[in-house]
Amino acid sequence: MDIRDEILKLKKEKGAIILAHYYQIPEIQEIADYVGDSYYLSKIAKDCEENIIVFCGVKFMAESAKILSPEKTVILPVMEAGCVMADMATEEGLAKLKEEHPNAKVVCYINSSTEVKALSDVCCTSSNAENIINNLEEKEIIFLPDRNLGSYIQEKTPDKKFILWNGFCIVHEAIQKEEILRLKSEHEGILTVAHPECSKEIRDISDFIGSTSEIINFVNNSSNKKFIIITEEGVLHQLRKNGEEKEFYIPYGKMVCRNMKMTTLKDLYESLLKMENKIEIDEDLRLKAYNSLKNMHKLGG
């Protein structure tokens, strides 16, 4: 029997649901019940009826699912699949910032550890950050860990004062302006579409900025035929499915998050078969972190 059939058989037997982020390999996206960005998947994990969630993504995503649904079994097929940016934010550093800015609200990107979420007032994703910041009464915002998303939201909410953590996504940060200008010069009429995790100099020369789901929606609804896609190349799988006649260009021909690409069909099969790699979170810590995620769903729309 084909491994895909084995996975579907196991999923049915165990009553599990498979969630996959847009940055996963195409084979994982194809077998998942739901494919989406962090915010969409967190809502599915919170509201789904299934008691077993297999989260094909990175650790902070699976942890967020467990924080929101402690009664459910949450499995991360590859426990080593972490997030470099999430690891840049520390509890100690955040605690110090909170002391220095006692009146500030702490907004953490969902790409954060459970410990950082526990010290934050509200979580956000790239698709709901602006909404959340606008819904906060406080004028002073500690934003972490992504300085690029933070500066982007700061531009959108000029009445707020931001204290930005100096973190970044190594995949988006690596893109240079010269490469984008080169692609633009080679392809007349091409549209540049970027994720807000990109630096300001990249955002400033882009035609559209949005989360992964917003990028996909923009491209799908555009009559344009050529696009520079400045985010992890996993989104190309969905874009090509929906727009076969369209051309897509990735800077340097490659934008890969190694952690997102770790999970294979074999890993997914093994984790379901053996019910291994379960996410466990101390209950006191979970309750503290739950607050920030609960507030995200309340304020994020």
Swiss-Prot record:
Q: How is the cofactor bound?
A: Binds 1 [4Fe-4S] cluster per subunit.
> Subcellular localization, per the record?
Cytoplasm
* Function text: Catalyzes the condensation of iminoaspartate with dihydroxyacetone phosphate to form quinolinate.
Reaction(s) catalysed by this chain, per the record, are: iminosuccinate + dihydroxyacetone phosphate = quinolinate + phosphate + 2 H2O + H(+)
User: What pathway is this protein a component of?
Assistant: Cofactor biosynthesis; NAD(+) biosynthesis; quinolinate from iminoaspartate: step 1/1
**Ligand binding (iminosuccinate):** H21, S38, Y109, I110, N111, S126, H195, P196, E197, T212
Q: Which InterPro entries match?
A: NadA, NadA_sf, Quinolinate_synth_type2
> Which Gene Ontology terms describe the biological processes this protein takes part in?
'de novo' NAD biosynthetic process from L-aspartate
Q: Provide the top EC class.
A: transferase
Residue sites binding [4Fe-4S] cluster per the record: C83, C169, C257
Which Gene Ontology molecular function entries are recorded, alphabetically?
A: 4 iron, 4 sulfur cluster binding; metal ion binding; quinolinate synthetase A activity
Q: Which GO terms describe its cellular component?
A: cytosol
> Which UniProt keywords are listed?
4Fe-4S, Cytoplasm, Iron, Iron-sulfur, Metal-binding, Pyridine nucleotide biosynthesis, Transferase
In this record, what's one Pfam family? Answer: NadA
Q: Which family does it belong to?
A: Belongs to the quinolinate synthase family. Type 2 subfamily.
Q: What is its main location?
A: cytoplasm
Which species is this record about?
Clostridium perfringens (strain 13 / Type A)
EC number(s) reported in the record: 2.5.1.72
Cofactor(s) for this UniProt protein: [4Fe-4S] cluster
Protein's name according to its UniProt entry: Quinolinate synthase
